[in-house]
Amino acid sequence: MEQVKKIVLSNGVRIVLERIPYVRSASVGLWIEVGSRNEVASENGLSHFIEHMFFKGTRTKNAFQLSNEMNFIGGNVNAFTTQENICLSAKVVDEHLSRAIDLLAEIYLESLFDEEEIQRERNVVLEEVKMYNDTPDELVVDSFMGHLFADHPLGRPILGPPSNIEKFTRDDIRAYLQREFAPDRLVVSIAGNFDLRRVEPQLRRVFEPIKPNGWERNPITHPTASYSSYNEDRNLEQVHFCMGTDGPKRTSADRIAFGVMDTILGGGTSSRIFQEVREKRGLAYSIGSFDMSFKDSGCFVITGGASPSSIQEVVGLCLDEVRRLYTEDVTEEDVESARQQIKSAVLLGMENSASRMSRLAEYEIYFGEYMPVDKVIAELNAVTRNDVRQMAEKYLKGRPVTYASIGPASSFRPFAGSLSF
């Protein structure tokens, strides 16, 4: 039974804690409910840029001293940015948890955003963009998102365009922080071996003084999906493609049944797409499906890579497998296999304090309350063959498809028109 406690400070900061007494690690994360979807077009990339700058010096430590402190406490100190969140995290031996909390708090609350460091890190981020642009199997997902959620922040790349990154200033950073970063958007999550009698007072001391800023935030708008086909012409050995449609939001009651359907279709080596395209026909090395979900929307994606000569056949096979989901009943064996895959991922994640810390934070951010693992497993076990077919009929049957690819222009001709599931 998980030992979870939630504390809401007077300024709106939420703290979620799970004590795991039988481990020697502790993981702490500062989750800020701000990401690329909070940005206007001219700010695109600023959330990710700020994430980088958090590690470049505070009032008492320069970047090198911060690195030394991270090395001293050992473990892993990390950060990432998504469409909806920025996370600063550390996984350490339990005896160093107090120092890890203070370190992350100092990074979050006292970063200087020095002009010289901004210029230096600007070059680092521009190199990151170049690296990403040289990775077509990842870049094509951004292209897909940009066309599915056209003219909406969810369709913009998290890293942002170079033209924005080259212009970001200290004033831009400060204005964005004042507008979007507020205590009621901060979730502090800790999982591992710790003494609540020591940790809770420390967290109150560090985070209770944060004052609401009172600034008007950029309004969050609901995305509307659009459907089109697009290819970026590159002289590559493979065509990297991504196709899909909009799907359930993060809090949808359909999320677990939809996950079972997705796993049957393209989640792993036993999935229908993988077996049909790779194992039976040898037409691709990488092929599969996944879903992404946000607070108010989501999307379902099939992605892979194939030779220009076989891309039309591969895409056709994927479409056939999608249509089978709503024209034929899946077997009980299919459903049970998918259940076991998802169940294993959930339960194995419970062996890791960092995974449990992330799970705590994500449930707080998206649901406002924690869902015990037993309840998740019970909902998973309740998914039936009929539920899977209903998900396919509700979210996929006849739905228009957005198709994006990166590869030779000649490979795109069969997909220049409209596609549908």
Spans of model-derived segments:
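Catalytic cores of enzymes that engage adenine nucleotides and/or redox cofactors via long glycine-rich
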Residues: 223-225, 276
